Amino acid sequence: MRIVFMGTPEFAIPSLEMLVRERYEVAAVVTQPDKPKGRGKKTAMPPVKEFAIKNNIEVLQPSKVKTPEFVSTIRELRPDLLVTAAYGKILPQEVLDIPPYGCVNVHGSLLPKYRGAAPINWAIINGEKVTGITTMYTDAGMDTGDMLLKAEIEISDDMTAGELHDKLACLGAEVLRETLKKIEDSTLQRIPQPHEQATYAPMLDKTVGCINWSKSARDVHNLVRGTNPWPVAFTYYKGQKMKVWVTSVLDEENHNFTPGTILKVGKDGLVVACGVGKVVIKEVQFDSSRRMTVEEYICGHKVGEGEVLGQ
């Protein structure tokens, strides 16, 4: 089967690796243009491009996909199937109509829940216990096409978005492999999505990470997990922005403390009151320094019990 693969970030790599390993004919890889990255704003290649170059696969990086030129380019590649995994652009119907087997997408949620750009993060932020992978036929909407295969994975209480991302990326490759086998032997069933059950996972920005200490300890902990490694949860301490990398839930009991109050300072972390319950902050980072444990931070900085975070 001749495939054009479309993907951009690390999430897409295991699926592309699987296609190469299983000896599918990958005619080309389509990925987003190179972009400035990091503090130095040096131009960086998408991870999928790096993999394609190492494996001698043609790379296309269109700035727009809704152009006659791009449609013509895909048509000239004569794919039997398009495969997408976190490509980052919605494909026009003209492109989807080119391959005889259509377009299969690898999505990081159990559709119709968490349609959109950041399903992994929002599943954790919202406190889900289970998520998974759905392969689906792509249509012109945003993750609205017929579902094909699903696989579930449990989300542990302390799992971060980064950890879940890596597990789902690998699971996605396995589900894609099974999907392609069923396409080849004509045993694949299409399941329309119950659109009335759809929920959405919009793209994250840095403001999402702002901790509201009036929320429950569980909600605060979920936000910290769901924004690790990006954009990272944060609060303010003595007027300085403080990133909060790692927390744990100490208890979920009612109390009379002002939310955000530091109740205890110790080598195990900062115990902080939330709207309901308390969390322990274990790892922090200030703009001028590296990420560090609270034990490391309090060795060189005085942190007082009774001080209030978020100010």
Swiss-Prot record:
Keywords: Protein biosynthesis, Transferase. Its EC number is 2.1.2.9. GO terms for molecular function: methionyl-tRNA formyltransferase activity. It catalyses: L-methionyl-tRNA(fMet) + (6R)-10-formyltetrahydrofolate = N-formyl-L-methionyl-tRNA(fMet) + (6S)-5,6,7,8-tetrahydrofolate + H(+). It holds the Pfam family Formyl_trans_N. The keyword Calcium does not apply. GO terms for cellular component: cytosol. (6S)-5,6,7,8-tetrahydrofolate binds at S109, L110, L111, P112. Attaches a formyl group to the free amino group of methionyl-tRNA(fMet). The formyl group appears to play a dual role in the initiator identity of N-formylmethionyl-tRNA by promoting its recognition by IF2 and preventing the misappropriation of this tRNA by the elongation apparatus. Belongs to the Fmt family. PANTHER family: METHIONYL-TRNA FORMYLTRANSFERASE, METHIONYL-TRNA FORMYLTRANSFERASE, MITOCHONDRIAL. HAMAP family: Formyl_trans. This is Methionyl-tRNA formyltransferase. It comes from Acetivibrio thermocellus (strain ATCC 27405 / DSM 1237 / JCM 9322 / NBRC 103400 / NCIMB 10682 / NRRL B-4536 / VPI 7372) (Clostridium thermocellum).
